[in-house]
């Protein structure tokens, strides 16, 4: 019997022994459940299954770090244009004689070691500081960021289930939108859910700058934001204390960031 055959028989024996020791072993679930809510009350109405690979990924801080560093690198403009020694304004003459002073040898006033001297490694704009990351690694970071928000109870999905026939509260809808344009409608939402000191991120399925919610969010600055689903980065997901996402946007994220594994 060859070595490969012996190895195969050994592995099969281990599998059989494991099955006999754990006769009632269970297969882990493939899906987790996300709650569908109405807006702005966030009243739950139904649940729908989401694959574990998307919303139940194990937390990997090293992968999140790689994604955030790449995003910040790519945001750098690279417009700095510091003067080098040849561009600086001072004379090229030595500040002191080479010998006879009892002091260390010095060059001209453009030396980088001098106060108000030139830059040793000057660059000429535009400078490209962008870095790259494998697509599969970035997709993993995105899934980890969403899974972290889901496990921490920070993710709220707004939408309607096809089979559910729940009744809505007055002023509610299954769309991520305010039903009226009252100037304090969003203030009521923030106060009711205790979000005054938290960062809130809204991600609609289709961004409309003329929508009531988009206009209301624009008055809040950086504390309450709304982004197009195509513009959301890993940093945005990690910075938000509450993620209010439409079901269409969540389906879009699932299709985009699990295409290499499902």
Across the structure, where does each feature detected by a protein language model lie?
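Extended polybasic, low-complexity segments that bind anionic RNA or targeting/receptor surfaces
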Residues: 2-73, 124-262
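Residue-level signal for pocket-adjacent positions within structured domains
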Residues: 45, 50, 83, 90, ...
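Glycine/serine-rich anion-binding loops at beta->alpha junctions
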Residues: 88-120
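Short coil/turn segments at secondary-structure boundaries
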Residues: 83, 100, 129-133
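A short, flexible low-complexity segment enriched in Lys/Arg and Gly/Pro that occurs
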Residues: 59-98
């Amino acid at each position: 019997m060859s070595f490969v055959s012996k190895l195969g028989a050994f592995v099969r024996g281990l599998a059989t022994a494991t099955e006999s020791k754990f006769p009632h072993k269970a297969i882990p679930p493939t899906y987790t459940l996300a709650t569908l809510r109405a807006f702005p009350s966030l009243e739950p109405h139904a649940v729908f299954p989401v694959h574990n690979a998307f919303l139940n990924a194990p937390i990997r801080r090293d992968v999140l770090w790689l994604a955030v560093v790449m995003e910040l690198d790519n945001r750098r403009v690279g417009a700095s244009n510091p003067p080098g020694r040849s561009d600086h304004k001072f004379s090229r003459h030595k500040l002191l004689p080479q010998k006879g002073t009892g002091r260390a040898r010095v060059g001209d006033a453009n030396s980088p070691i001098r106060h108000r001297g030139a830059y040793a490694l000057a660059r000429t704009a535009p400078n490209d500081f962008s870095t790259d990351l494998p697509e599969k690694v970035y997709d993993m970071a995105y899934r980890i960021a969403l899974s972290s928000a889901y496990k921490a109870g920070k993710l709220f999905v707004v939408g309607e289930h096809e089979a559910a026939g729940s009744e809505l509260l007055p002023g509610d809808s299954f769309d991520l939108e305010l039903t009226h344009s009252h100037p304090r409608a969003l203030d009521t939402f923030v106060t009711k859910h205790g979000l005054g000191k938290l960062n809130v991120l809204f991600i609609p399925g289709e961004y409309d700058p003329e929508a009531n919610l988009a206009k209301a969010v624009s008055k809040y600055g950086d504390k309450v934001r709304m982004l197009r689903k195509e513009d959301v980065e890993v940093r945005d997901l990690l910075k938000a204390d509450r993620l209010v996402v439409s079901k269409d946007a969540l389906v879009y994220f699932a299709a985009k960031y699990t295409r290499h594994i499902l």
